[in-house]
Amino acid sequence: MITSSCPPSRPAAVLARAALAALVALGAPVAAQAAVVDVTVTVSNLAPANGIAFAPLHVGFHGGGFDAFDLGAVATTPIVSVAEGGAGGAWQAAFAAADPTATRGTVGALLLPGASGSLVLRVDTALNPLFTFAGMVVPSNDFFIGNDNPAEYRVFDATGALSIPSITVRAGEIWDAGSEVFDPAAAAFVGDNGLRTPQGSVVAFNFAELAAFNGLTTGAGYTFNSGLAAASEVYRISFEVTPVPEPASLAMLTAGLLGIGALARRRRAAADDTALTAA
């Protein structure tokens, strides 16, 4: 029986160093590819128990071409489609028309106090570094959350790194679309949202009116109590990023690893043959 406790030969050591260098070189394109990422968007209802709920949140990563509404202006059809009923079909369609390369989606279902939901979107951070959102607040006739400045949230910097890990919305930032007359009997979540009466006003901040729904039974079965102050945190949007390697880089890395493995096996076989011959 032949045994050996000799240290690795110099060629083996050279091979190990070469393999490491190759891995670094082949892996560099993967690490450097920061433009395309998978973004997990998580939404959380921070409102007190028995308080406000939220319709599914409409979201989009974009380049700045879509502006759904403005403070002090008459609500547009896209934002009304969110504020009155929460469906947001016109919002999504207008977003797609204004910014065709944007990445859009809808997060969660009805979000009750304390609940959360998430969605994963693949985002080109160089093309779509900005984030826009809109979602109905219930109970209400036409209240919603969202950003009126499309450039307000630049969540990715020039290198593709995440620059805003989360967005927190306070009660004082809840919007009134001014498109539907206040009427508990026609309010979503506590009444018949189909009984709408146009108001013809303008978009404004308004959370205080939510207290007028106190004591009413919600669609979820609890007795509503707003319990909000202007500084109360009511909603959070969080972002978590996972890099997406380029397909070409993955192919190169796989081929390189296979090649290095084959070379290592040949070197070991040659070394074994030499040792046997010498013995």
What are these regions (language model features)?
Residues 36-62, 217, 221, 227-242:
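A long-range scaffold signal marking pre-active-site subdomains of enzyme folds
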Residues 262-279:
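C-terminal membrane-anchoring or membrane-association module
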Residues 28-35:
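Sec/Tat signal peptide C-region and signal peptidase I cleavage site
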Residues 36-38, 46-162:
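Structured domain cores in non-transmembrane regions
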Residues 246-265:
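A short, hydrophobic C-terminal helix/tail in secreted or cell-surface proteins
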Residues 1-13, 275-279:
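N-terminal secretory signal peptides that target proteins for export/translocation
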Residues 164-241:
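Extracellular low-complexity, O-glycosylation-prone Ser/Thr/Pro/Gly-rich "stalks"
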Residues 17-27:
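Bacterial N-terminal signal peptides
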